[in-house]
Amino acid sequence: MKCARLNDRIIHLHTYSREHYQFLFEEGIKGHLFCSHCGKPVLLRLNIADPPEFIHRQPGDFPACEEACEPKPSKEGKKEDDQESGVIRLPKGKAIAADPSPAVTEWHRPRSIKPGTPFVPKTIEPDTSLFPSVGLNTDQLKAVTETEGPLLVLAGAGSGKTRVLTARAAHMIEHLGIPPENMLLVTFTTKAVAEMKERMANQYGLQPAKVRRIVTGTFHSLFYKILYHSNSAKWNGEHLLKMEWQREQYIKKALYEEGIDEKESPVDQALQQIGFWKNTYVPNERIPLKDEWEKQVYRLYEHYERQKKEHSQFDFDDMASACYELFIERPDLLEQYQSRFTYILIDEFQDINPVQYKIMQMLASPEQNLCCVGDDDQSIYAFRGSNPSFILDFQKDYPGAKTIYLTANYRSTHPIVSSADIVVKKNKNRYAKTLEAARDDIQVPVLFYPYDEEEEATMVVSDIKEKIQNGASPEDFAVLYRTNSGGRAIYERLHQSSIPYTADRGVQSFYSRRIVRQILAYLYASQNEDDTEAIKHLLPALFLKQSALNTLKALSITEDCTMIKALAKLPDLKPFQLDKIKKIVPFFASLRTMKPVEAITFAEGKMGFSEYLKKRGNEGNKLEKGSDDLRDIKVVAKKFKTIPDFLAHVDHMRAAEKNRTDEHGVQLMTIHRSKGLEFKTVYVLGTVDGSIPHDFSLETARKGDEAALEEERRLLYVAMTRAKQHLYLSCPANRRGKTANRSRFLYPLLQKARQPLHH
């Protein structure tokens, strides 16, 4: 049905602003929508495959209702002196001034993506000559048996990389008689290490004692062991800053010593930048400082290093550089390890950073039995110092090296693999190769077009619900997004549903972000001018130190006024500060009755919050900017009519952040976190320019550097190849309150698109 009754008014979808469909959806959930013919409760159906329509809450056939709701030409035109805004009728010339609505957008039927090439089934039987229980294809067998000299194995997504690594190690031990203790197998996660050991014991029949003798571990664990054996007092594990909060404490102390309010500097980003400098192994005096943010972080870096030295402590990044320096200073020690590790296997080679690679090269000499397994198309960790150039230049570093391509994908269907391949082939800096699926399927990737982030989340959850009702398990699904803020709406929608889910901590903490807390503080303070927590978050935006909080508490008592009004009575304020605060204080009462999005816009402009954001300058976080958070919170605020209702929602979601316990169900995660995982059904959110690819990569590309843009394309490739059977790519028409353009990475797919998908 295309019509329903809301608040004694008939709603016709064909004349109703698409912007407000999400509002109608939520009104239906609350029981406020009714059939305009029979009067029974109805819902607005918003899903991926079908046009939006009203459906009765109770299942059944309602032909009379459907017939009554067929659109009829209106005999009376709309009154000229009125215009509509959602369900509110406004006098002509008047509008809600807070945030102009984007243009009405028609619903577009989703499109299916045609495979770039026809599926060609492979009839080659797997080879079981090495291990009867483990079949290997021709290329895998080559990678397993090519044991001498430098070898690069380019293992495409889902091509059996772990099988090759474990089979190779088992073959060398069982069939070639190589002592396990002479083998070094290095990867990036303890989970991968455990999985490889388990496979070697269970699938290949290696004796547990032999498996234990293989030196396996992460880069960090390997470097720690080497350092500990060289100087156990200095490199004792008790001196390691294992936890993130320990490192953050030193940065916070450094901020204090520099006279910087810790609420004004993203500690996590400072630590990430410091880690990047360490992992690229640039001497301190030669670190290029590009802007004021990096200059500030460099000063924090110096404080951080000094504090660690004073306490004889070290962090994970220190171990790599220290190990490298140890081998430079102690060639005799390096020679001992070279004699010990005559065969080296490196997993996820595309993620290696400069220091790690230098150490592995040193250990591999002079035998050069170095086997590196990776995929240049999955290099997505530039922010950690990794660089695809190491895998791309392997032949230059080792001119006699052999290269083996693993291009058979056993995870995903042909339509998914073909689509992902079309996307990544637009990159220039990569090995020329074509990934091929081992199986076909009639299900093809789907592009769908929600109005905005809110409708996007509703459509995805509706689709998941429908699939679960048809027998799917919640664990079959993953929802992927570029940055944590991109998962905010889907997190909220799943929280409101009965579907079990698990989410990254980052997406759960949206309402705890610094900028979000600060802008919301204006709204909280408007409702309660003695809200200490809100005022604490307001102070930085008013360019006041946290020490002012206690003064405000005292003044509110001695002057018999609210803490907000006490702001204008603070002593020792500079004249410009006093003038500004006197101007702002009365505005809190004005905010009280505004709509939430109006209040946020008012605080931005009239109360100076946008000016504060500009003065803060570069936050150091290229991916999650404060201004982006501000746009995100306005998208949420639009859904609520009153500030108390909006803040109740915020409080509810903050409580949910603290109380989440589910470990199973639909997986919500960033694309980075999804790497190495696989799911039957994958939804990729926000495939629009500015999200995937991210704004910062578009900016650098405009300046002539396309490295970041190519990494963004690899990121989409990684997201697409997580899907085993169903892949959905979302292209919202609006993002963060502005019109969005579908991702430029999708253009090659759209050229291959079939006719619109029919449900």
Curated annotation (Swiss-Prot):
Domain UvrD-like helicase C-terminal: 414-676
Binding site for ATP: G158, S159, G160, K161, T162, R163, R411
SUPFAM superfamilies to which the protein is assigned, alphabetical: P-loop containing nucleoside triphosphate hydrolases
Entry keyword set: ATP-binding, Cytoplasm, DNA-binding, Helicase, Hydrolase, Isomerase, Nucleotide-binding
Cellular-component GO terms for this entry: cytosol; DNA helicase complex
Highest taxon above the source species: Bacteria
UniProt-listed GO biological process terms: recombinational repair
GO MF: 3'-5' DNA helicase activity; ATP binding; ATP hydrolysis activity; DNA binding
Main subcellular localisation: cytoplasm
Aminoacyl-tRNA synthetase is among the record's keywords: no
Pfam families assigned: UvrD-helicase, UvrD_C
Function: May be involved in the generation of recombinogenic substrates for the subsequent action of RecA.
Similarity comment text for this entry: Belongs to the helicase family. UvrD subfamily.
Record-given protein name: Putative ATP-dependent DNA helicase YjcD
